[in-house]
Amino acid sequence: MINPIAFKLGPLSLHWYAVCILVGLLLAVYLAAKEAPRKKMTSDDIIDFILIAFPLAIIGARIYYVAFEWSYYSQHLSDIFAIWNGGIAIYGGLITGTIVLFVYCYYKVLNPIHFLDIAAPSVMLAQAIGRWGNFFNQEAYGKAVSQLNYLPSFIRQQMFIDGSYRVPTFLYESMWNLIGFVIIMVWRRKPRSLLDGDILSFYLIWYGCGRLVIEGMRTDSLMLLGIRVSQYVSVLLIVIAIVFIFKRHRQKGISYYQE
């Protein structure tokens, strides 16, 4: 088993979970800042937004998780703040971040669809990296299986939990996001085939479909009325994206890059 603590400095500990999130964040900011000028925005617009949105998104992700696990946290109130042990919900962070984005764009007089188009591939890459935090914390895994011989030994060993090998759903989602990121980056090199909002819509559909399937493999899902909450949200995002694409293309929307 890999120690979930990356290193200690006196009384302070830095967990691998946090390292994965921070590495994903830094790469996401770099990519978004690089793309911003092509969408009539500046790198400062991106950085200023991240400084506001990131801490709020983490809080939102934690609130989302705690809300659906309230039966536990109501009896362990001090654990609500133990975020280093895991327990942040990606959808909670995405919802919070999107709300902050619309407010930010309103006050900065920016086009939120442009911003979301820029953010989509960066977020997808950050998610691909961030999922490895679940690996180090031994969470977000699936059912017990007899063997995992198709995986490298370090993953097999870390996925040996409670006396059994577990389906590495974190890995499936990480790879799914990475593939989606590559598709977007290749597709974005052909802007004539893109309309404003297409990258955002692709992200919602791609991530939503992957999460819908992979969530069904997990054994630690947040539940609502007997159905996994993330599957509810995934279906909703897919429907929203399809409707958005249909309307955008039917109305002959604005090209992805404007001259």
From Swiss-Prot:
Subcellular location, record wording: Cell membrane
Identify this protein by name.
Answer: Phosphatidylglycerol--prolipoprotein diacylglyceryl transferase
Identify the coding gene.
Answer: lgt
In the record, the note on similarity to other proteins reads: Belongs to the Lgt family.
Protein's membrane topology:
Multi-pass membrane protein
Question: What cellular component GO annotations does this protein have?
Answer: plasma membrane
Which ranges does the record mark as transmembrane? 12-32, 46-66, 83-103, 109-129, 167-187, 194-214, 226-246
Per UniProt, the keywords (alphabetical) are: Cell membrane, Membrane, Transferase, Transmembrane, Transmembrane helix
* Task of the protein: Catalyzes the transfer of the diacylglyceryl group from phosphatidylglycerol to the sulfhydryl group of the N-terminal cysteine of a prolipoprotein, the first step in the formation of mature lipoproteins.
Report residues binding a 1,2-diacyl-sn-glycero-3-phospho-(1'-sn-glycerol): R131
GO MF annotation list: phosphatidylglycerol-prolipoprotein diacylglyceryl transferase activity
Recorded source organism is Streptococcus equi subsp. zooepidemicus (strain MGCS10565)
Task: State any GO BP term from the record.
Answer: lipoprotein biosynthetic process
In the UniProt record, does the keyword Transmembrane occur? yes
User: What HAMAP family does this protein map onto?
Assistant: Lgt (MF_01147)
InterPro entries tied to this protein: Lgt
Instruction: Cite the annotated pathway.
Output: Protein modification; lipoprotein biosynthesis (diacylglyceryl transfer)
Q: What is its EC number?
A: 2.5.1.145
